[in-house]
Amino acid sequence: MQPYIKSLEQLVYPQYCNRCEISLSEGEQLYCSQCRVADIKPTKLGNWVRGLQTHHNLDYAISFYCFGEVIQAYIHHLKYSSWNSFLTRLINNAVKAEELPMEASDAVMLPIPLHRVRQRDRAFDQAAVIARELAQQWNLTMDESLLKRKKYTKTQTTLSIQERQENMYMAFQTAENTPKAVILVDDVLTTGSTADACAVRLRENGSTWVGLVTLATPKLKKKYR
């Protein structure tokens, strides 16, 4: 009943964006999503692979934005096609601020895969949505078949770094003869252990350069510039 009353209230007393004055959609407050995108600035910190707890098998790592409530909301809403235009703007702004290294000029974009159980629970794959948009803007190919998640992994917060690496390594399986250069893609980056485990598998099957691109991270610090 409450959602119905709220929708009826918005219909009778519509709310407007404080900046552009268009009608706010359900879930928006004070400012519309488009105006919020304009306020989110890319980190411009470049390659900060040395800042990851586990990075020995990664050559490159960038995170476009610092993770906060606004970015979290965008990631949550990626499953709705109406939000894709906002993702396009977010990535377009970030791509302008970051240049890929020469080693990645012909790289293949690869979203870090979810286990089928987790993907079923989420009903969509954020990493794949982001990777598809990045591939289009960077004019690169995307191939989701290069890496499969064969093992479901529970939370790893109680595990040591070495235990996390071993646990994640066993979770993935790659195709034979992977491309020389691969860019892994995910929504949010924390320790880097998942990406590093993926990189190990890719290197075992032919990849010589593995990078990582994420939409956001809560761990960016300027000392990793």
Give the label of every model feature segment.
Residues 1-186, 190-225:
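Glycine-rich phosphate/pyrophosphate-handling loop used in enzymes and phosphotransfer proteins
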